[in-house]
């Protein structure tokens, strides 16, 4: 099994070597092993390979129109997978979910971070000022 996680503001993915209740031991593509807090794990997946997921998700992220995503994002706090299901389809792929995560993360003028993988829509006034 592979894991996508956030570490110090950066997204990484690797193979889960072991998992406990509070953390997981993950091997990155480089061979480096890292201990990841369970709260930082955002996605679990079997396929594709971690580097492939990140590459495809970055491509998908660039196709997401922020204005459109902001328009139909819920007013309350929401998760990246929720937005992916609203934006793409009810059956958003793993790559689409990760792409939504990357796009939301890089657009603080549209979406504020409300926790690991959680976001809140920025007020309309803030968005107008940013544009």
Report the location of each language-model feature.
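Charge-lined substrate channels and their catalytic hotspots, especially those that engage the 3′ end
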Residues: 1-131
């Amino acid at each position: 099994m592979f894991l996508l996680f956030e570490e110090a503001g950066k997204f990484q993915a690797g193979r889960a070597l072991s998992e406990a209740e509070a953390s997981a031991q993950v091997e990155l593509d480089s061979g480096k092993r890292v201990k990841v807090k369970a709260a930082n794990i955002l996605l679990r997946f079997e396929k594709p390979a971690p580097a492939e997921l990140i590459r495809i998700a970055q491509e998908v992220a660039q196709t997401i129109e922020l204005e459109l995503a902001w328009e139909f994002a819920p007013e309350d706090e929401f998760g990246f997978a929720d937005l992916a299901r609203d934006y793409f389809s009810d059956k958003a792929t793993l790559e689409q979910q990760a792409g939504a995560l990357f796009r939301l993360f890089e657009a603080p003028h549209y979406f504020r971070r409300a926790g690991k993988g959680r976001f809140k829509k920025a007020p309309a006034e803030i968005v107008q000022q940013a544009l």
